[in-house]
A protein has these predicted regions:
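Histidine-acidic metal/acid-base catalytic patches
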Residues: 29, 46-51, 55-61, 66-76, ...
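Glycine-rich, histidine-containing beta strand-loop boundary motifs that form or position
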Residues: 7, 37-39, 77-82, 210
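A short glycine/small-residue-enriched secondary-structure motif
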Residues: 33-48
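Long, hydrophobic, well-ordered secondary-structure blocks that form the structural core
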Residues: 77-100, 105
Length: 328
């Protein structure tokens, strides 16, 4: 009966008041459900960049953790993906059984980067075959389809940016000049240095969502994409409130990730899970797949099994359940 939701109407970096949280709880409860996990409390670009209003935003984030805890909500998902958060190129990809799902195609994303975003040097990230296919794809789109394609990438999927235009994305990208993976990891550590003590005080957990897709995009570093990233993160901030939202869909989209190995190695840090399966193709594209399917020989029934084991363990002074959401 539990659900994952967020207060999407509140601007990034602002405080979630007890009143707003309670109002959403009441709405959820009116359907016989319980809001027990936040997905997500967004981390502002200022925090990721440690510029502008980042100090105020961090203080507001701490207060939001306190206010959520006061309302009994202690599972908090967040991500540290720069600029565009989650990325897909097709929000209505049709499967053979007639159902629809989400898809990422590197050729289509190349068309976005090169012809719409016009990112300098984007061509260097693609093969000649991909560049030729991207040009052909872009030329196949008329004006309306081009605009719809642009919006599907920058303003529709879960990392909704509330009406950004392509020029805004260019300005956001420019702010990351000189920010490499090492520096972004330092910014994540400094953010966690501030918020984890508050989470510990109230028995809350901060669960980072893996990068989706789990590889660099737009020339930007992604720092929660592979096992070594999480090893570094937990070593830098060993607090028991520092956890992962183990998203099988995001992680499996990177063929460098060994999902069973990561599940076994990180199980002490897994407090929340997204049980999704992904079909990865040789051309680098991937799409959502039914969760009863197999990926690379991995039986996803092992994840609920690990969930049951986790429920038997005591963490932060009490038993905690590993949460799951419907596939998406």
């Amino acid at each position: 009966k539990s659900v994952f939701t967020s207060l999407h109407q509140i601007s990034y970096g602002e405080v979630w008041s007890v009143e707003d949280i309670a109002a959403r709880q009441e709405k959820v409860a009116s359907y016989g459900l319980e809001w027990d996990t936040v997905e997500s409390v967004p981390v502002s670009e200022d925090i990721k960049l440690r510029s502008g209003d980042f100090e105020r935003h961090i203080e507001n984030y701490k207060q939001t953790i306190r206010n959520l805890a006061a309302c009994g909500i202690k599972n908090i998902i967040y991500n540290f993906m720069p600029v565009l958060d989650w990325i897909r190129t097709d929000l209505h990809y049709r499967l053979p059984d007639g159902s629809r799902c989400l898809r990422f195609d590197p050729v289509q994303f190349a068309a976005f980067e090169i012809y719409l975003l016009k990112r300098e040097g984007a061509e260097k990230n693609y093969t000649q075959a991909q560049l030729e296919a991207a040009e052909k794809f872009f030329e196949s789109l008329d004006g309306d389809k081009r605009k719809a394609f642009e919006r599907s990438i920058i303003d529709v999927f879960p990392g909704c940016k509330m009406g950004l235009e392509i020029g805004d994305v260019r300005k956001m990208l420019a702010k990351y000049d000189g920010i490499d993976a090492a520096k972004l990891k330092t910014h994540l550590k400094l953010f966690l240095d501030e918020v984890l003590p508050v989470a510990e005080e109230f028995g809350s957990v901060m669960a980072i969502h893996p990068d989706d897709p789990p590889f660099d995009v737009l020339g930007l570093p992604r720092i929660a994409s592979r096992f070594s990233d999480f090893q570094e993160m937990f070593a830098a901030n060993p607090s028991r409130s520092n956890t992962i939202c183990f998203c099988t869909g995001s992680l499996s989209a990177g063929l460098h990730n060994d999902i069973p190995q990561m599940l076994d190695a990180l199980r002490e840090r897994i407090y929340i899970a997204h049980l999704r399966s992904t079909q990865v193709n040789l051309d680098g594209s991937f799409y959502e797949r039914k969760t009863d399917d197999f990926l690379l020989g991995y039986d996803y029934s092992r994840v609920p099994e690990a969930s049951w084991e986790k429920q038997q363990m005591k963490n932060i002074g009490r038993k905690r359940a590993l949460c799951a959401i419907p596939p998406r």
